[in-house]
């Protein structure tokens, strides 16, 4: 493998524009060693290292069966269509690679047979159904990702099934099942690409979902704790209860059995009563206690429904088990303690473990295959101790390789001198004025990452009409469509929050200014964050130093990483939060970021961009 990453090596011969990077070769060597010795590895690779090829090449060279688990579908597609073919060509390996997704991503032939399109409303779903007709006749995979016009969640739910609704071998369409076909192909593959959620479902199922494998690479590993918490937690939602009732009615019709109308009505009424009893005014609200009486009544109603369905045939037996599983989720919300947190949402009741480390240690790290964790942000401070502690990964080597980019030449960090405290009422308005001024200096070409949806709305209202650039806003179009427009319309501005802090890759001039309004501390009152801070205190730690600060540092590094995506990129990161300068922990944030010049005068930004004329705020 030594010559693959060198000048004139296999990758240079495969990719005409390949640039050898010592950091990529070092990362590949560390991964090769881990695979050879069967050791877990936590590897941080700075932006631009080319981490995908750095793990794919040693994975293919090892001859082992490897699973790659990602957090996003975009990375799955990139691996399948771009990176794996390059790695295979460079290593001379004839590799069988398959992407495997959860069942709900595949068309269900049985659901399709019973679908009644005349019930579709006019508009988007009607158009989506019409557009699907040719695809239904020609698709070989049934994968929703093939569709050019995205159906709504409600429409796709009518045409697909999750694992809790699948009849398995009892289904008359089992031999032609798209999901089973995908699993069969994955069982024969050398390399299987999945997402974090499906890998954790594999662990939860007693290793029954994926083929046996020697190693797993967790790419985008900075998101593993949240993925694991979601897997280990549960929820009871208004939509889920309605879906259960819908499936019961449909299965009864198909089996020519009487619909248990009384039991279904009671589940609907008691579910609605519980959800209304805990509903927050907005967002998420932590529940120190779930009202026991409405919860117990809903559990009883679900038990009665399960009893009414039991023994009525295989499909109704499956729905009986699903009803009991829903009752178990409600019961879990009642059993709160130091290790579990529950919260309410406008349409759901949810719970999650506060700490996933013990479960991951026992079920994955101690008993599972060799694990390689890769991300651009796994160290908070000098090492990956924080992330390893959160994940329960006690025995693992660490590798840290920096970015090949020249940040002192390519980037400028701007922290304005006179911003108010971010917790004050005047901050959002002052930040909006600063954003408008900066957009004048950068000629648009900006991504603005906000701390909340409220701030997003305020900046949208303030910026539109004050700058001569197209202003794109998260929520006004699907994520990928927004990113496509942002890349194509070079002087456009994208305002976003939440998921846009990571996984956004916009090389070139379209992203020349990155604005971050506040240091990304979790919002006060976030149930899971609050419970984790309390758990740290109970264990004798300091909630801020040992959890809140390193978590925010990792998030800020993710946001910063959106700016420089290539050797030719140049740009400014503007962080409008004065705490970066005024609080002692500001030095920790600055030390965590790539080294580059820091300025507090907008004249430095103007000079960086070539003295463009500012737009009046």
Predicted regions and their residues:
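Walker A/P-loop NTP-binding motif
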Residues: 32-33, 52-65, 82-87
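Signature of the SF2 helicase/ATPase Hel1-core->accessory helical subdomain module
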Residues: 61, 77, 82-85, 163-164, ...
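A substrate-engagement module of RecA-like helicase motors
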Residues: 1-14, 47, 64-190, 283-286
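Conserved helicase motor "Helicase C" RecA-like lobe of SF1/SF2 P-loop NTPases
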Residues: 451-475
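Conserved RecA-like ASCE P-loop NTPase motor core of nucleic-acid helicases/translocases
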Residues: 66-72, 372-374, 444-451, 575-576
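Conserved pre-motif I regulatory segment
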Residues: 1-43
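A contiguous, basic/glycine-rich beta-loop/short-helix subdomain that forms a polymer-engagement track
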Residues: 157-190, 205-207, 304-419, 426-433, ...
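Conserved RecA-like P-loop NTPase helicase motor core
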Residues: 416-426, 471, 476-580
